[in-house]
Amino acid sequence: MAQLDDPPFPPGRYPLIVLGSGPGGIQLSHSLSRLGVDHAVLTADEQPAGMFRRFPFFQRLITWTKPYAPTERRTRRYEWFDWNSLASDDSGLKALVPEFMDGTSYFPSRAEMQRGLEAFTERAGIPVRYGCSWEGTRRENDGSFTVGTSDGEYRCGTLVVAVGMTEPWKPADIPGIDQVPHYVETDAPEAYADRRVFIIGKRNSGFEIADGLLPWARQIVLASPRPARLSILTHSVAAARARYLQPYEDHVLGGGTFVLDAAIERVERTASGFRVQASGTTLPGALEFEVDRVVAATGFGTPLRDLPDLGVSTFHQDRLPAQTPFWESPEVPGIFFAGSITQGSIGLKKYGRPSGSAAVHGFRYNARVLAEHVARTRFEMDLPRRSLAADEVVPYLAEELAGAPELWHQQAYLARVIAVDRERGIVDVGILPLQHFVDRGGGDAVAATIETGEDGTIRPVVYVRHGGRVAERVLDGDPLLDFGTAEHRKQLAAVLEPILE
């Protein structure tokens, strides 16, 4: 007989299993529970919060939460200013991270982020089987899955992998890089005092290490083949964030830090440290560095275990699984992904900008959309959808464009979709992946989203499907990002006239 303190979800059969208790897994579990989808959550961790218990190494996140914002806290619109709390329709579960922030920065510390996630898990009553390591997976003849764990075998018809991009990754084609500590093995800053430090990689983890070592290192060099992509220039959260750009300013002002475009050709151990051989790319030429320490800030991959043996394909140097717009493996139906892994569903990538799915502010909405998709398609649940009168469509879409956090955080990736049918009427289909809307086809409908144009202007964009063809209509921007004005409503009404008349 089970005891009250026994861990939940003993080995057995469950309709759906979520692997992982980081923010992606917790968000998905909460969303599934709200819809009434029975599932189990398994994790190797001993507590929720995943990588935030260890990283970022220098404590502060690069995503902000603004305790004081021009909108009321615990509202949907406030999520626009709170990039770190999980999302819920329950006002008591909204905006939990700012509760734990001490006011010294609007970038939460990892401890503040951890406490926010723990509070969400506890207050939402999300049961998790901790200390249960995923060890392997089999696909059965009936299409179901057997998940081998340290606690025994589990069976399910739907499997969602939310283990994060947590596997340290290094490029295999650089001789000697196996001797180089990865970002996750970074020592305490004092260990780099008066040392020459070479950092392989110029993305956020590389700039984070460089920024943290500025008061300690004698000299810092960051290098990778391509120029650094900066968020303030690319208008993309996937680029190096301004939070860590002091080393870049040090470089451009000649302060002794160097940010170089160079391909690393070899790393050798020497009696006093390392010798790094490189070849300039933007400015061709051989380069050689004698340094005391080297750090490989070369990123992470997804620990997929044996999923590739089941047919799950990968890309990005095998670091991400390929996914449909609804985050499902194209080759293995029934295997889905949540959390930061969902950046493997690329979307339209307009103007070369990726989605916001690598971080909480983006993938929390992916998880909510995924929960509804799974409920409808895997469990045949008939979820209610709101009907609209014709004269309600323009005000409703204008309001969404003015402040729906899903559209602002997942620009050109998620969209509010409204379908128009002569028999069924006008229906709010909900938030959907924009790529799905554009590629799938169907009856008359509209998808409204926010996009940042090639010139960096943020503006509303509406995709109208009429007579089987999709037309893209760009509305005017606004210097104060107010897209609910009378002029925007007028433009919106004109765009929608063909399907609403």
What is the meaning of each model-derived region?
Residues R13-P15, G131, A193-R196:
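Phosphate-coordination loops involved in phosphoryl transfer and adenosine-cofactor binding
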Residues L19-D38, T186-I232, L304-D306, F326-R378, ...:
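Rossmann-like dinucleotide/flavin-binding elements
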Residues M1-P15, P23, H30-D45, R54, ...:
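Rossmann-like nucleotide/phosphate-binding core characteristic of flavoprotein oxidoreductases
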Residues P215-F315, R378-R386, A390, V394-I431:
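A Rossmann-like FAD-binding core segment of flavoenzymes
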Residues Q47-E112, A223-R241, T342-G356, Y396-E399:
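Glycine-rich active-site loop/strand segments that organize a redox cofactor
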Residues L159-T186, S279-T324, G352, G356:
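Glycine-rich beta-alpha-beta "Rossmann" dinucleotide-binding loop(s) and their flanking helix/strand
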Residues L86-T158, V163-T166, E265-Q277, R293:
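Feature captures the FAD/FMN-dependent oxidoreductase FAD-binding
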Residues A2-F9, S109-E112, T158-W216, I220-L222, ...:
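Glycine-rich dinucleotide-binding loop and its adjacent helix/turn
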